[in-house]
Amino acid sequence: MFYDDDADLSIIQGRKVGVIGYGSQGHAHSLSLRDSGVQVRVGLKQGSRSRPKVEEQGLDVDTPAEVAKWADVVMVLAPDTAQAEIFAGDIEPNLKPGDALFFGHGLNVHFGLIKPPADVAVAMVAPKGPGHLVRRQFVDGKGVPCLVAVEQDPRGDGLALALSYAKAIGGTRAGVIKTTFKDETETDLFGEQTVLCGGTEELVKAGFEVMVEAGYPAELAYFEVLHELKLIVDLMYEGGLARMYYSVSDTAEFGGYLSGPRVIDAGTKERMRDILREIQDGSFVHKLVADVEGGNKQLEELRRQNAEHPIEVVGKKLRDLMSWVDRPITETA
């Protein structure tokens, strides 16, 4: 683990950093780098809706190609599915020997969608939290833990540069963990697909469907399997599984111990292993790239099917009653 005393802020202060993208992480990195005394410019395509926001926040903005030409550290924070095209068209032609190419996620490099030239350093600085939290913690004098990894290090200074960058966005205040592009990428994809997004979503929908099919009101089913999920996850987030079980009733704890293994059993675990193998051997990324190249047709169809699920219909109606819930733009428009 690395902390403030392990990182030299002056290293990144002596470089010119171009941040490609201004989404959740892009805005947090750019503003915190600037506030740490680093020269920074944001790379966005002409006509990007984020350009006025960047300018309002006092940052310089130019095209990705011009920013890559100006910078000697390029942090790529554009969406995963756009990175390879941006790299090939805008970044790679403007890289110079001795430059550094940074990423917030290792997917494109690990699976060979981006192949950097041998004379540039390739590293990753990945905060383990959303951009708004990274920025808020930085402003409050705190930080969000980060992962760092060095994939390519022609001059031998890649780790020091990555740690300096992490310090500039507040990461070393909380702690920085050294990893590899391989481990970060594969564990991130596995967690998303089997637990955080895919697994949780299907578990919620299945529970909702079982209750509704048994004759219970959809509103009650929604509250029991989706709305209250946040209460349980928050307890786990704060103190692990033990904190969750300490905080719920004995009835809930006893029932959870008995029934949980019947829902998530050895067969589930074996299928999770299958998914991990598909991530490791590149099968998943192959499907992802094929869908992107085909115009995201499969993704759009899956989105449509998900949006039409009955839990989404009843959920929108119930959230209209919850004044304390922040509503997404799609529900308030």
Swiss-Prot record:
One Pfam family from the record: KARI_N
GO cellular component: cytosol
Pathway: Amino-acid biosynthesis; L-isoleucine biosynthesis; L-isoleucine from 2-oxobutanoate: step 2/4; Amino-acid biosynthesis; L-valine biosynthesis; L-valine from pyruvate: step 2/4
Matching InterPro entries: 6-PGluconate_DH-like_C_sf, KARI, KARI_C, KARI_N, KARI_prok, NAD(P)-bd_dom_sf
Binding positions (substrate): S249
Positions contributing to Mg(2+) 1 binding: D188, E192
Active site: H105
Cofactor names: Mg(2+)
Function recorded in the entry: Involved in the biosynthesis of branched-chain amino acids (BCAA). Catalyzes an alkyl-migration followed by a ketol-acid reduction of (S)-2-acetolactate (S2AL) to yield (R)-2,3-dihydroxy-isovalerate. In the isomerase reaction, S2AL is rearranged via a Mg-dependent methyl migration to produce 3-hydroxy-3-methyl-2-ketobutyrate (HMKB). In the reductase reaction, this 2-ketoacid undergoes a metal-dependent reduction by NADPH to yield (R)-2,3-dihydroxy-isovalerate.
HAMAP family assigned to the protein according to its UniProt record, in alphabetical order: IlvC
Name listed for the protein in its UniProt record: Ketol-acid reductoisomerase (NADP(+))
UniProt organism field: Mycobacterium bovis (strain ATCC BAA-935 / AF2122/97)
